[in-house]
């Protein structure tokens, strides 16, 4: 195995293809719009309990970037994963779902 410092720089080679990481897409309901250009959405997921086998609902809240502030509380929205806007905000508003 070649040590790291002796490996050729592959990213400068024209033959190397750049791989894109598939981005996550989430759907949820807007819970809060009290921050500037940020909304909080709640995403529900159903999962089987590992031991008992019962289907359990889990909820998680995400902060998403809404630059035009077009969301309001109760809207069902779609958001895409993107670069970090802050420590906890790494989703961008895509569109409303009706």
From Swiss-Prot:
GO terms under cellular component: cytosolic small ribosomal subunit
Keywords: Ribonucleoprotein, Ribosomal protein, RNA-binding, rRNA-binding
Cysteines engaged in disulfide bonds, as pairs: none
Source organism, top-level taxon: Bacteria
Molecular function (Gene Ontology), one example: rRNA binding
Record-linked Pfam families: Ribosomal_S17
rRNA-binding among keywords: yes
Subunit structure: Part of the 30S ribosomal subunit.
PANTHER family in the cross-refs: 40S RIBOSOMAL PROTEIN S11 FAMILY MEMBER, SMALL RIBOSOMAL SUBUNIT PROTEIN US17M
Function noted in UniProt: One of the primary rRNA binding proteins, it binds specifically to the 5'-end of 16S ribosomal RNA.
Protein name: Small ribosomal subunit protein uS17B
Species of provenance: Bacteroides thetaiotaomicron (strain ATCC 29148 / DSM 2079 / JCM 5827 / CCUG 10774 / NCTC 10582 / VPI-5482 / E50)
């Amino acid at each position: 195995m070649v040590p790291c410092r002796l490996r050729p720089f592959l990213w400068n080679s024209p033959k190397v293809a750049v791989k894109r990481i598939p981005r996550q897409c989430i759907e949820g309901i807007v819970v809060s719009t009290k921050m500037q250009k940020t909304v909080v959405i709640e995403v529900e997921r159903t999962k089987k309990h590992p031991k008992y086998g019962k289907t359990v609902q889990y909820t998680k809240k995400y902060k998403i970037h809404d630059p035009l502030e077009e969301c309001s509380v109760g809207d069902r929205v779609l958001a895409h994963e993107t670069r970090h806007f802050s420590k906890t905000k790494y989703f961008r508003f895509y569109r409303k779902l009706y």
